[in-house]
Amino acid sequence: MSIERDRAHVAAQAGSGAAPVNRKDEHVDLAQGLRGERAAAASGAGAGHPGVWEDVRFVHHSFPGIARDAVDTSTVVCGRDWAVPFHINAMTGGSEKTGRINADLARAAAQTGVAMATGSVSPALRDPELAGTFRVVRENAPEAFLMSNISPEMTVEQAGAAVELIDADALQIHVNPAQELVMPEGDRDFSHWLDRIGEIVEGVDVPVVVKEVGFGVSPRTVAEIAARGVVAVDVSGRGGTNFIDIENRRREKQEYAYLSGWGQTAAECLLDLQVEGAPLVRTSGSPVQMLASGAVSTPLDVIRALALGASAVGVSGHFLNVLLTDGYDALVEELHDWTEQVRTLMTLLGASTVAELQKVDVLVTGSTAEFARLRGVDLAALARRS
C-alpha cells in the first residue's frame, strides 16, 4: 500500500467512525513508505547518487600494522562498557503492533549483545494500559543496556517512572521542536524545556542522554545541555527518518513540504563540535559524550561517525526495515554481520580501538566540507592528523 493510500485509509477510518489508527502505528507505516520513496529516488538518480555520509572518506594505507583478531570493538557509553560501538536506537512503542516490534528488537539485542533504546514511553506514562508495549523490552532483554525515552514535557516524577518501567540503564530525552511544530496535535511552547531537562537530570538516578530526532544539534545546543548536567548528546542528524515529512503527510494540506531538508546531518554536527572552544564540558568539569545517529545504513557509516568523534552510533530505520521486511532471523544476522564488518573496517584503517579510530586521517568533501569551512573547521588538519 502506498503512502497516499495509507493516508487516505487513515482519513477514511476517521471519517467513518471506525477505530482511529494509532499515531505510533501511523508513524511506522509512513516511515517505511518514505524510506521506500527515498530508495527509489536514489536508484533513479543512478549509482553515483550520494548519501549524507558519502562526503566523509578515509586515506588508505597499504600496511594497517595490526591483526584483525587484535581489534577491540568495545566502547564506553554513560560509564558502561558496550561490546560494539553501535546500538538499536529509539523507535516506537505504544500500540499492540509496536509492542510486537519492540519485543523482537529487544530479543535481537539480547541475542547479539547490542544496546537498545525504546521509543518514547510518554504514551505509557499517560495511559498505563500501554505500559506492556514497553515492558516487553526488558522482559526480552534482561541483561542488555537499555535506554528509556521521554519528551521534555514529562515531569521529574514521570521521568523516574520511565526509568522504572523498563529498569533502564540510562534515560534519553528527545528534543523535537521541528516535529512538534509540524505535527497537527504537537506542542507549541518550548520555553520550559531546558529547565525541565535540568530538573530531570537532578531527579533521576541514571545518566541522561539528550537526543534530537533527525535534525541535528549545534554547539550552542550542546552548551545549553552541558549546563544542565546531561551526560551525553545524540546529534541525530538529517537524512534518515524524517519526522517533518512524516508529520506533514498527516496534515490535510501537507503545506510544510518545503521543510524536508531542514537541519544538519550527523557528520556536519560532529564536525561543528570539533571547532576549538566548542562547549563540550559539563558543569561538573567532565566532557559531554557525543553519540551519533541519522541516515546510518552501513557499517562504514558507523566508522565514519566514530572517526569524527562519536563514542557510539545509533541505528533506527535500517534495522527496523530489516525486521519488517525480512524478519527476526534476518535482523539477528544483520547485527552479527555489522559487528564483524566494523571489526574488519577498523583493521583496514589500522585502528585497534575506537580511540585510535578517532586519530586516523579523514577527508571531508562536498557540501559537508562547505558547511564545515563556513563554521570554522580546519579540514586540512583533520586530513593529516595521523
Kindly give the residue locations of the regions a language model identified.
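Active-site cofactor/substrate anionic-group-binding motifs, chiefly glycine-
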Residues: 76-123
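"Short basic amphipathic alpha-helical interaction patches in structured regions
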Residues: 100-107, 130-133, 162-163
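Alpha/beta enzyme core
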Residues: 106-111, 139-147, 152-293, 299-319
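Conserved active-site-proximal phosphate/metal-binding subdomains
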Residues: 3-10, 15, 28-31, 229, ...
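An N-cap/entry alpha-helix motif that binds or orients negatively charged groups
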Residues: 1-82, 363-386
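A gly/proline- and charged-residue-enriched helix-loop-helix capping module
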Residues: 112-150
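Short, solvent-exposed loop/turn segments at secondary-structure boundaries
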Residues: 99-100, 128, 183-186, 326-327
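Secondary-structure boundary/capping motif
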Residues: 97-98, 125-129, 217, 323
